[in-house]
Amino acid sequence: MSSFSESALEKKLSELSNSQQSVQTLSLWLIHHRKHAGPIVSVWHRELRKAKSNRKLTFLYLANDVIQNSKRKGPEFTREFESVLVDAFSHVAREADEGCKKPLERLLNIWQERSVYGGEFIQQLKLSMEDSKSPPPKAAEEKKSLKRTFQQIQEEEDDDYPGSYSPQDPSAGPLLTEELIKALQDLENAASGDATVRQKIASLPQEVQDVSLLEKITDKEAAERLSKTVDEACLLLAEYNGRLAAELEDRRQLARMLVEYTQNQKEVLSEKEKKLEEYKQKLARVTQVRKELKSHIQSLPDLSLLPNVTGGLAPLPSAGDLFSTD
């Protein structure tokens, strides 16, 4: 069970995804560290404002899970979140995608029905959402552009394997190779290979897995000990399930990378085969020229075999001899 630190929380928030498993896993971890409720909410609020628009709603889902599931253990989170929720709702309503308004309203209705917060505070949150919905035209246009970009990205990510492949610049090959190697190396420390955690899970007492054994508990002290053990088991299993889910996504991503890498290498191979054929033809032409040149050289007369036509003749007169008066 990892200890609390702001840097650890920042890392976990950066890895938070919009899945129930991811939200519940982090929620359990936060509730376990509820004595740090103040710093937790402060980091949550800061990271919410820094998060990409498509992830902001997930931060509020996390806050909801923490607030509702921590109430029986104490009011720490309910109180701490209350101090930042007005700004958080206003910020998310203003900065997140247009489709987030209905989920936010549904969340507030649930809080009102379950009396998570008082009616006056709920109304304040609703008003903060309404007041934030009038961005300047330029900002609205930029947000729309961002939204389209995110949708395009989502459409690409929804396919486990690309149905079509667009040729890549061969110069991207080394970068893709490095990414593939890193992805393979990261999987060496995957959750499925964590023997230590698997041993901890295997060593959990039978009481945390078998409801029928609860009848054997006869005193409050034993019940409290078991409650603590069950809480720790829930956190251990939730964290491990979260890691396994992340590993599964990593392996899917690796499979996509392998498909892309294979396609890239096929294109590079095809290009190199064309180059090889081109240079084979050049070699053949140069070899033919060499052969013809050798044959031509062999057909030329050997000047060293010609007779010495100047032998026995007087040397030609010099310029001085020609103009001499003697």
Curated annotation (Swiss-Prot):
Subcellular location: Nucleus
Membership in a protein family: Belongs to the UPF0400 (RTT103) family.
Key words, A-Z: Acetylation, Nucleus, Phosphoprotein, Transcription, Transcription regulation
Entry coiled-coil feature ranges: none
Reported function: Interacts with phosphorylated C-terminal heptapeptide repeat domain (CTD) of the largest RNA polymerase II subunit POLR2A, and participates in dephosphorylation of the CTD by RPAP2. Transcriptional regulator which enhances expression of CCND1. Promotes binding of RNA polymerase II to the CCDN1 promoter and to the termination region before the poly-A site but decreases its binding after the poly-A site. Prevents RNA polymerase II from reading through the 3' end termination site and may allow it to be recruited back to the promoter through promotion of the formation of a chromatin loop.
Lineage of the species this protein comes from: Eukaryota, Metazoa, Chordata, Craniata, Vertebrata
Name of this protein: Regulation of nuclear pre-mRNA domain-containing protein 1B
Database matches in Gene3D superfamilies: 1.25.40.90, 6.10.250.2560
GO cellular component: nucleoplasm; nucleus; transcription preinitiation complex
Distribution of this protein across tissues and organs: Widely expressed in the adult with highest levels in liver, colon, prostate and uterus and lowest levels in heart and kidney. Not detected in rectum.
Pfam families, per database record: CID (PF04818), CREPT (PF16566)
Organism: Mus musculus
